[in-house]
Curated annotation (Swiss-Prot):
PANTHER family: SYNEMBRYN (PTHR12425:SF5)
Species this chain originates from: Caenorhabditis briggsae
Principal cellular location given in the protein's record: cytoplasm
InterPro entries documented for this protein: Chaperone_Ric-8_A/B (IPR008376), Gua_nucleotide_exch_fac_Ric8 (IPR019318)
UniProt keyword list: Chaperone, Cytoplasm, Developmental protein, Guanine-nucleotide releasing factor
GO cellular component: aster; cell cortex; cytoplasm; kinetochore microtubule
Keyword Transport (UniProt): no
Cellular localization per UniProt: Cytoplasm, Cell cortex
Family named by the database record: Belongs to the synembryn family.
Example of a GO biological process term: regulation of establishment of cell polarity
Entry GO MF terms: G-protein alpha-subunit binding; guanyl-nucleotide exchange factor activity
Record-given protein name: Chaperone ric-8
Role of this protein: Chaperone that specifically binds and folds some, but not all, nascent G alpha proteins prior to G protein heterotrimer formation, promoting their stability and activity. Also acts as a guanine nucleotide exchange factor (GEF) for G alpha proteins by stimulating exchange of bound GDP for free GTP. Able to facilitate synaptic transmission in the nervous system probably by activating G(q)-alpha (egl-30). Also able to activate the G(s)-alpha in synaptic signaling network.
Cytoplasm keyword on record: yes
Designated gene of the protein: ric-8
Amino acid sequence: MPGDQLTEETIQRVFLNATSAKIEEFFSKWNFSNANSTKFGMSEAERNLLGDEISAKIDNDDLASILLETVRLISRERQGLESLLNENLCDTILKLAGITPVVGYPRSVHALMEAQKCLVNTMFHSAKMRERFYMNLVNGDQIQRFLSEFEDSRRENSNIQWIREMNPTQAAEVWYFYHRIAFIATAMDKGFQRHWADQSTTVSNILCAAEVCLQKASDDVANLDLLRANEAMKTFFNVFCHFHGDVPGLDEKNTHLACRILRDVICSGIPNDDVIQSAIHALSVPPLPMDLSVLLSDPNFPIVPLPETISEEERVHPRDYYVNMTLTEAILAALDKQLIKAVDLLNSVPFNQVSPEGNTLVDLSGPYFQALARLCVESKYARRYCRIRVLPPLVADEVKKRPEEHDSLRGRIVRVMMLPSTTKEVASEFLFIICKRSVSRMIKYVGFGHSAGHLANFGLLGQINQPKHASDSEDSETEDYNAVKDNVNPVTGAMYPPDHGSAMDGMSDAQKEFEAMKLVDAMNKLMDQGLVKPGTIGDDGKVREVSHVLELLKDAPEPDTMDSDSD
């Protein structure tokens, strides 16, 4: 570790009867030497002593910034952090960060910023700091207020003096760190999430930073603006992602506001994939209603109320006006861009190995499928558009390869369905929705092998052999596909390979019997180990274990009596 080791002897020497100037001089050098350190090699006793000494001095105006920086650096190391932090130190950091409202605090912008950065680290790594933060709901209310109070017009007229007195550069950075703190606070405690989800001011306060980006010309949007907007939408996701049904904070007014801001961000063309991703994630949260009047309306064709004299048969449902697919296309394009990166990473390693980075990208694409699926459920126009974009009518050339081998959005989605992840489920559900929940169409496009898990989970295996509806093929097949579809393997979704002869050609009957018995023995071994169990499709359409192998024969056809030797 660079610089002086913070042993008990060193700590006592620095603080014992030392002037503020001497303490500042020592820790200025120590902080500089350890600016890039992540390990500090301190014992529990050394951390306890340092925490007590810093706690006693940190409220000194001359030392606050430098000692906060020291705590921030040491808090990079999760191990042993609880020994450093005591209740008084935690409360002082909250006070210096302006979060616990106390008259006369914060005292300086520099100390405020250091306290914010310190709080980001300690909130993330320390249960003790989180406990001190969450025990007072005023802390959360204060942060939420700050999420919108630093917008230029509000800051200039704020009734908080220290906010009014900041210059724009300082205010921009302080505002960003309050969003960082809000993101961590909303990620760590469900009770805190519920508190914010129940408030009518939450949506407007959180998304204020995103709206500021939209109000600026693209050339005027600074990188810090984008970082702040990104944190804001991640916080929105944290607050609402665990709830279902009606949430007080998402009333009609706030739903309209959230959908408008998120739509505009997604469609804005902002050259920042993280911001677009966070907006799509926020749009996907279950309790946020899909407000089609915002998400799919065409601003060039406003809805005109129809006269009351028009009959019900002549009336056009308002949803029939919501045919603007700009948002739908933007989400599809962002999804495809994400999956191109993910599939490239997955294919860059051997099939039996894992690409952690590729799997992470796949996991992050789950909300894209969720948002699209919800749009498609609410709007037949969105569903049709997605079906045309993702599952265009099949042609003969497309079934020469397996679905996952295609360099297309469909191929990449099927590749995702091959992974053992939760994204596999939402990707399958999205495809099933745009297949109009048709089992036969789903199998045709992705193969039974890829769709079996989804069909089994939803009890749909019993529909596999049902007759097709005319609509299953009328808009999903071409003439050249019809010419080859009888040669398509329904399991793989691709054509059978050319016949290269049977593997048993040239074998004697004794050899064939020997190979058959080897297969039987191998299957018996797997069954004895519990790795394989005989199963059948139950009345609910799901796979169930059979109690006896004879169950597998109950629906077998009777033997042809014409070949019987009996009279």
